[in-house]
């Protein structure tokens, strides 16, 4: 409710309990009742679904209200400041995922001349290539789920959650940019915001279009194959693919994601220091979404809520297991980084209205333990790559091993498998053959505990290899975020080992850009 009142407009924040199918009219009525009338405007600050009591599932909404009946002052709103000035500096960014896009956008806004080099294709072309891949099984180096415009996140659930507490300004900038590019405004206040792959495929190109309008350049379907150095600095990178040649620059940002093993090895060969870091591996589980809904809500659907989601953990002493990247109403996809590997991931659209739900079930994995002692970053990549190849070599194809959860926890052999969202074949298999014994035992125990927490969990299927929860290695970054031994090299995003997910990676890209700007004189 708008007002042109000349009286002082005060501010207050209120919390409302609302039915899941509340209307805009009901929301305004409840606000008016809470502040005892008067003219007011409002905005939703936070909204979460409270399903602790299945007989009384509702939204809890935190509302910021401005009204002539209130006396409080509104909170100070801080925004990320990007100062534009004339600069004679060229920045070459490798990778067009969240970190690369937002680092590039900020730097281009600040007056730098930025070129993005991306191994994969533009989003629309990438979608065509993926469709062809799923029909033929022929892997396209430039058109898979891992690489291309928007990174792996373009073909995901588009989750925008982040547990990082030190990125509030960067996070707000990311959300504002996404909303401006077409994301639903609700992402700014949902406790578990998500965009959906169908919307991301339009939003990301819109952001890239803004970047280009500012003068930025993007080279798709080309990969960095060589690094040229001049003393303690990188002077240029060599690229091959749709474009071939040498790209010179004053600063270089590698935002290549954690599936680019070739780039990791190139950087390591140039003396960039990486170390191993904790990460997790496991498989995907899939259920009928209706069964998940009923287990969580005791009803098949809930008006006003797209689909039920779960977040499960299990104490598997020693160690633990947990669900990761749950995709309600989604599907499982073959997210192989190359033609000899097999890795699964989950994705869903904005409506989350598919028949199936899927999630990773993973447990921490020690590369040192697998190697029998201390291990270099390069050797760590070899170990993980070998595991990804093992899943491909199972059938020398992108079909994947799978088993019913009930058979896994009872030690039985799976004879047949139910219908699945996966676009390739599921092959009944003994999943214990693909994992180190201690890893598999933790995963199995985790499944047993999850079956006690969700009564439909035993009805599901485990499938494939989930190995991309986070990077297996981490680069050494100086206080100014440069990567030793170079003074003009920055490594950010998931590939750096310092972030995970769309928002934290985008924020890391922004922080990298700001640090570069601060050091540029």
Language-model features: locations:
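Residues forming the flavin
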Residues: 4-57, 63-155, 159-177, 181-521
